[in-house]
């Protein structure tokens, strides 16, 4: 098997801890029933439309906060930041990405935006320093699973899809990448994700640098 030479990573839920526990913790803090966010924002047609517009950059995070808050019955102030307040770096995947880069793999980020102000999901992660390419959906008026957004990431890396691995915690986006020629990896347990990446890239991703 020929090994891949590029690695494209989703951000939230891959280089961070999982999203769902953070959302559930927010619901508990706000006194909401469990599953309220999923129902209002990801199952409701209007909620889905709002999130897609945010990801494409056609509305701001503040506009999203103000539109989403009444659907949940909560205050709009920094709503996105409150929802994801419990997210933390997923250190094992961050370290694995760094190991891949040291081994000569080109490593890029491809993330659907949640807006950048007033709360910035990417603060403190030094994306522009640590990765060869950073593609945030709102900057391109697109969102995963749009094929054109994957093409932006590939162009920045200077690689073809069949030279790359794509990692995401959302199965729909993994499948979209696979249709383009990427080797897809669904991120669930970090240890399993890293083991799969080692097999696809042909380089060790754990241990001291």
Where on the chain are the PLM-derived regions?
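Residues within well-ordered alpha helices
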Residues: 25-26, 52, 67-68, 99, ...
């Amino acid at each position: 098997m020929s090994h891949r030479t590029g690695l494209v990573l989703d951000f939230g839920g891959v280089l961070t801890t999982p999203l769902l526990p953070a959302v559930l913790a927010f619901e508990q803090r706000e006194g909401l029933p469990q599953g309220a966010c999923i129902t209002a924002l990801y199952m409701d047609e209007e909620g889905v439309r709002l999130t897609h517009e945010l990801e494409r950059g056609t509305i701001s995070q503040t506009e999203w906060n103000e539109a989403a808050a009444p659907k949940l019955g909560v205050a709009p102030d920094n709503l996105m930041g409150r929802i994801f307040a419990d997210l933390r770096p997923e250190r094992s995947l961050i370290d694995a990405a760094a190991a891949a880069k040291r081994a000569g793999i080109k490593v890029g980020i491809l993330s659907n935006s949640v807006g950048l102000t007033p709360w910035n999901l990417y603060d403190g992660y030094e994306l522009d320093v640590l990765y060869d390419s950073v593609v945030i959906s709102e900057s391109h008026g697109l969102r995963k699973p749009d094929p054109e957004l994957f093409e932006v990431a590939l162009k920045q890396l200077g690689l073809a899809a069949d030279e790359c691995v794509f990692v995401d915690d959302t199965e729909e986006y993994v499948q979209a990448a696979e249709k383009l020629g990427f080797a897809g990896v669904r991120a669930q347990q970090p240890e399993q994700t890293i083991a799969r990446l080692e097999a696809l890239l042909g380089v060790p991703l754990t241990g001291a640098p």
